[in-house]
Amino acid sequence: PANFVLGFGKIDGRRVVVGGEDFTLKGGSPTEAGLRKSVYAEDLAVKYRLPLVRLHEGAGGSVGKSKHASLPSAVFNAPRFRSVAQAMATAPVASAALGAVAGLPAARLVSSHFSVMSNSTAQIMIAGPAVVERAMGEKLTKDELGGAGVHTKNGTVDNAAVDEPEAMEQIRAFLCYLPSNVYELAPVSLCNDPVDRREERLLEIIPKERRRAYDMRRIIKSVMDEGPVFEMGRGYGKSQIMCLARMNGQPVGVWGNDPKVLAGAMTADGANKARRFMELCEVFHLPIICFVDEPGFMIGSQSEREATIRHGANAALTSALLNVPWASVMVRKSFGVAQVAHYGPDAYVLAWP
């Protein structure tokens, strides 16, 4: 049997395609039948224009001998990643790491619009501890090599969850802001938040002392519709905040600088995080609201080693090519080349306070 489970389901009443490796068969290591089925999952998402949810727990390719000899499949075989790319260009793709994930399943995991890993059960690795020890001389546990403490900080995954049920809930929350496919608009919810609601705390949230930091997340929470705000990638590129929220019931992408981290300066990681978020909003037609408190690119020797100027320029170029509506609010400052990324083409710009 194929060691990949595939089917249809519903999330908040919307149909989705869902699939994942069966770890009880060869540890989820891709077999010919399992690989064909995983490609078929992506084909179904494209054909029926449905969101794709992947639940991963599988090893990389097996080096063991099979009783039934067959010609090996080339790692660059087009269907493997053409189907992944086509799915991501057509419908939302959300992935969860629920156990140890390595090799090809790990590559599919990160090839998604949103990824989450279970803090208690999941690890993501190119190769496992035994291979790493033999090849590199590093003796590490699976968690030390590829646990949530590693991959939420380097941007391999967007978020961590306490356990598998919370990982599923995060996928549900992510999908509720997005359309079923790129040919539709995001679902607008009934808004019970009065348009004349006043947030008096905003009057004093910005310190008069310009060297003092403040809580940008409080500003975002106060301005958006009352209710949940879904943050992505909080542990990575920490000076930049990326959220999905609603404004008058309309799903929007929200980007803000975090003055509590490097005064909000854009790092290489922050630039990559912003670029990826802008691409998500562009693909699924989400307007962007940007709260700008940008001192510029982070400076110093580490910043130069990380090629911050290159990654930052790429973020600015991505911003310049977007077509979605864009509104920017200058909260305190907006300096340097880095500020360019915060204002999309023909942005509606406000200065506050």
Residue ranges of predicted features:
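Ligand-binding clefts of soluble mixed alpha/beta catalytic domains
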Residues: 1-353
